[in-house]
Swiss-Prot record:
Full protein name: Phosphoserine aminotransferase
EC number of the protein: 2.6.1.52
Chain positions recorded as L-glutamate binding sites: S9, R42
SUPFAM superfamilies in the cross-refs: PLP-dependent transferases
Cross-referenced InterPro entries: Aminotrans_V_dom, Aminotrans_V_PyrdxlP_BS, Pser_aminoTfrase, PyrdxlP-dep_Trfase, PyrdxlP-dep_Trfase_major, PyrdxlP-dep_Trfase_small
HAMAP family documented for this protein: SerC_aminotrans_5 (MF_00160)
Superkingdom of origin: Bacteria
Gene it is expressed from: serC
Location of the protein in the cell: Cytoplasm
Lineage, uppermost ranks: Bacteria, Pseudomonadati, Pseudomonadota, Gammaproteobacteria, Enterobacterales
Role played: Catalyzes the reversible conversion of 3-phosphohydroxypyruvate to phosphoserine and of 3-hydroxy-2-oxo-4-phosphonooxybutanoate to phosphohydroxythreonine.
Protein source organism: Klebsiella pneumoniae subsp. pneumoniae (strain ATCC 700721 / MGH 78578)
Co-factor note (free text): Binds 1 pyridoxal phosphate per subunit.
Residue positions where N6-(pyridoxal phosphate)lysine is found in the record: K198
Length: 362
């Protein structure tokens, strides 16, 4: 079978080595004669899987000991509710930075629980979409917390600045599409959350990193399944967790450590992004509408000079083993999601195809 590269924004490509190991262990996990999907989440065998996954995740991100790591249900959208329900306390106002589609979605959900002060950070620089620097974000004195999304998968916009608003500002962030792709200073955040289906593992699992002093503040209306304190006190097993997704995430964490950790992935991700953006920028046939300072290294949207060729581009790229390149319906065009599991060879294959397509149709 010819090599296939999956550029889907999520569920996304998983490391081939992880899939092969999961395949080998699927029906007989560690000699038990059963699948890891079938064993009790409270049995010693799965407890070991869970503990190792958390230890490896902590090591990869250098998570301090005063932070809890929760393995949850609900996805990023679940945390759009989970953040205000857990962090708002007796306050009513929270700051929300709007820099794209997912940040706006978080605002919409938050309105059910609080009064969001929406900081519109979207600007235009030399005709391209960009984001205001953090120094220009007008925060509300005494707000319960600040929420933002460091990487917008649909818009292809990234905010790579490290928050530095002082100890009085609780920073919460949706890292779903950029977690583990670059090093971050966890100490600068009160809560970090990430859906697993992009850089962690399969869909169905959500990771939350929460500072311990923020526990115990949940609203009385907060469902127990979203209550960080309940989840922490029950080691993320208040109810049956998504065990197979948890197991696969653990395999991905071990794979990442074998690759050299997050610092090594950061360098590889930079190489992949530079290669793809280089082809786009040096072409009169393709274009990207995001200012260079805010370009995402994970999600690269691009347009063809003639949109009438979009259908042909997608058909030919799919036939060439380059799958899921269709852009989101909101922005159209193409989008290549190049998360950690996408090898450099996959991006090279894509850029070779793009250059050939341009020669034939430009």
């Amino acid at each position: 079978m010819a090599q296939v590269y999956n550029f889907s924004s999520g569920p996304a490509m998983l490391p081939a080595e992880v899939l092969k190991l999961a395949q080998q262990e699927l029906c007989d996990w560690h000699g038990l004669g059963t699948s890891v999907m079938e064993i009790s989440h409270r049995g010693k065998e799965f407890i070991q899987v869970a503990e190792e996954a958390e230890q490896d995740f902590r090591a990869l991100l250098n998570i301090p000991s005063n932070y809890k790591v929760l393995f949850c249900h609900g996805g990023g959208r679940g945390q759009f509710a989970g953040i205000p329900l857990n962090i708002l306390g007796d306050k009513k106002v929270a700051d929300y930075v709007d820099a794209g589609y997912w940040a706006a979605s978080a605002v919409k959900e938050a309105k059910k629980y609080c009064t969001p002060n929406v900081i519109d950070a979207k600007i235009t620089v030399d005709g391209k979409r960009a984001v205001k620097p953090m120094s220009e974000w007008q925060l509300t004195p005494g707000a319960a917390y600040l929420h933002y999304c460091p990487n917008e998968t649909i818009d292809g916009i990234a905010i790579d600045e490290t928050p530095n608003f002082g100890d009085d500002v609780i920073v919460t962030a949706d890292f779903s599409s950029t977690i583990l792709s670059r090093e971050i200073d966890v100490n600068r955040f009160g809560v970090i959350y990430a859906g697993a289906q992009k850089n962690i593992g399969p869909a169905g699992l959500t990771l939350v990193i929460v500072r311990e002093d923020l526990l115990g503040k949940a609203s009385v209306a907060c469902p127990s399944i979203l209550d960080y304190t309940v989840l922490s006190e029950n080691d993320s097993m208040f109810n049956t967790p998504p065990t197979f997704a948890w197991y696969l995430a653990g395999l991905v964490f071990k794979w990442l450590k074998q690759q050299g950790g997050v610092a090594a992935m950061d360098k590889i991700n930079q190489q992949k992004a530079e290669l793809l953006y280089g082809v786009i920028d040096n072409s009169g046939f393709y274009r990207n509408d995001v200012a260079q300072a805010n370009r995402s290294r994970m999600n690269v949207p691009f347009q063809l000079a003639d949109s009438a060729l979009d259908k042909l581009f997608l058909e030919e790229s799919f036939a060439a083993g380059l799958h899921a390149l269709k852009g989101h319906r909101v922005v159209g065009g193409m989008r290549a999601s190049i998360y950690n599991a996408m090898p450099l060879d996959g991006v090279k294959t894509l850029t070779d195809f793009m250059l050939d397509f341009e020669r034939r149709h430009g």
